[in-house]
Amino acid sequence: MSNYAPFIKPYVEYNEHGWGPCEVPELDVPYQPFCKGDRLGKICDWTVSLPEKKFPSKYASTFGNSSQYAYFYEDDDSTFHLVDTTGSKAFKPYQRGRYRPNVRNNVRARGRTGRGSQAVGGPGGPAAGGSTANSTKYGKGRNTRNTQNVGRRFGRSAPTRLRESSVMVQSDWVSIEEIDFARLLKLALPNIKEGKDIATCGSLEYYDKLYDRVNLRNEKPLLKMDRVVHTVTTTDDPVIRRLSKTMGNVFATDEILATIMCCTRSNYSWDVVIEKLGTKVFLDKRDNDQFDLLTVNETSLEPPMDEEGSINSAHSLAMEATLINHNFSQQVLRIGDQEPRFKFEEPNPFEEQGVDLASMGYRYRQWDLGNEVVLIARCKHNGVIQGPNGEMQFLSIKALNEWDSKGSNSVEWRQKLDTQRGAVLASELRNNACKLARWTVEAVLAGSDQLKLGYVSRVNPRDHLRHVILGTQQFKPQEFATQINLNMDNAWGVLRCLIDIVMKQPDGKYLIMKDPNKSMIRLYDIPENAFDSDCNDDTESSETFVHSNDN
């Protein structure tokens, strides 16, 4: 036992009156509050020449900036002071990039720049040689209507205004199919050959090349052209009635085909009536003039929202754009009894005695869509021009109109048209993507050699009756389709898909309608007398379009 160290019993305090130790020594150590989020740094860093100016206190303590936590080792009572109740400025610790706004993924930032980084003419297409993003740099070109979004909570936008349907769906209509745009965009029908001419009618006037020199310094007023343009539908066309007896099984006009083939770019509601008689299908339009009106800023982020009756309402702007397009397409031609005209094989099928008809050439063309589907459609040209080698080049003449650059969220034409025409065209491709796509499809279907675009603006934003021509531009339809990301294979695929669905249905009357508030089209089975009342009321308005005298 002597080899082991002695065991000494430790002293254990026993508290008879409570828990814990009986006595605690006074250490007199002050308590300094701290934060676990404080950054750890060096007391002195000799590797830098100057202290950091942007964040000089990034290593400071969160609780070290208030005098109430300061410790003074003094025995004198003079160090006693009251607690400062005025409050000090809260110290924000250094946190790199924690609350930095992410501009790249900011939805509002993308909306201000107008999608300037996407491909030309796609859904929201960008600049053809320019970008509209530069117009908002340094605060220039800002839209005053965007100030209505200021003050809203994040993720909340203005209430969406529901659009009206082009036709009222009746209770006795049977819904057959609903196809959303996502499915339609996946369709394709490649290797469709150029249309074959079956019949050509009408006569064309020659284009006046002086309008190619029009610019901002040499603008020309838009004149009123009192010439009649027929907008006869498919079943009322005498040439189509004659051709349907011997050839083809699907019949339509270029406006109807373009509306269906470009449906994935449309926002407004529209409808097409279909009549199936045995193996023949007629794509028709209702007896009203709404189908022939040109939309304005349909695909814009801020489409026209003014009330009906205003000069800037959607319907008023559509009427104005349609009249401008009619006047421009006739004014740029060499009109006169002594001027030469290009005449097709047959006369104008809609000619009337004592009526001054507009320059219009009709081509009835045939396409083989496969699976025994033969399409025959009436296409048109607006003018003709002689090429450099003496050949005749047919023109499709259209006009873009500016009504209010500030209210329409677009580029100021009078400032950018001569110097940055690509930015102006990119703005129009963004705001009127559907209308430009339809014009391009119509030019491709007709086999036009050139697509002439005119830029027409109001003399005063508050005056919708007077306009001036600011410039013109021309494109080859196929090249322009590529430029605006218009896939003709997809357009033919959409048309063929709807034709196949109708071919499987029994004989009767059907209607294709674009949903006014959803990205889809609907197919209905409707009664034979569904639109008899409209037919009796609007027969005259559906056959001709005459320039109104009050515009």
Swiss-Prot record:
List, alphabetically, the Pfam families matched: eIF-3_zeta
- Write out the GO MF terms: mRNA cap binding; translation initiation factor activity
Keyword Iron-sulfur attached: no
Q: Where located?
A: Cytoplasm
Q: Where is this region: RNA gate?
A: 290-304
Record keywords: Cytoplasm, Initiation factor, Protein biosynthesis, RNA-binding
The entry's cellular-component GO terms read: eukaryotic 43S preinitiation complex; eukaryotic 48S preinitiation complex; eukaryotic translation initiation factor 3 complex
Question: Region (Disordered) spans which residues?
Answer: 105-152
* Biased amino acid composition, Gly residues: 119-128
The GO biological-process annotations, alphabetized, read as: cap-dependent translational initiation; formation of cytoplasmic translation initiation complex; regulation of translational initiation
Q: What is its main location?
A: cytoplasm
Function summary:
mRNA cap-binding component of the eukaryotic translation initiation factor 3 (eIF-3) complex, which is involved in protein synthesis of a specialized repertoire of mRNAs and, together with other initiation factors, stimulates binding of mRNA and methionyl-tRNAi to the 40S ribosome. The eIF-3 complex specifically targets and initiates translation of a subset of mRNAs involved in cell proliferation. In the eIF-3 complex, eif3d specifically recognizes and binds the 7-methylguanosine cap of a subset of mRNAs.
Oligomeric form and interacting partners: Component of the eukaryotic translation initiation factor 3 (eIF-3) complex. The eIF-3 complex interacts with pix.
Family, according to the entry, reads as follows:
Belongs to the eIF-3 subunit D family.
Domain remark in the UniProt entry = The RNA gate region regulates mRNA cap recognition to prevent promiscuous mRNA-binding before assembly of eif3d into the full eukaryotic translation initiation factor 3 (eIF-3) complex.
Among HAMAP family, the record links this protein to:
eIF3d (MF_03003)
* Designated name of the protein: Eukaryotic translation initiation factor 3 subunit D-2
Whose protein is this, by species?
Drosophila erecta (Fruit fly)
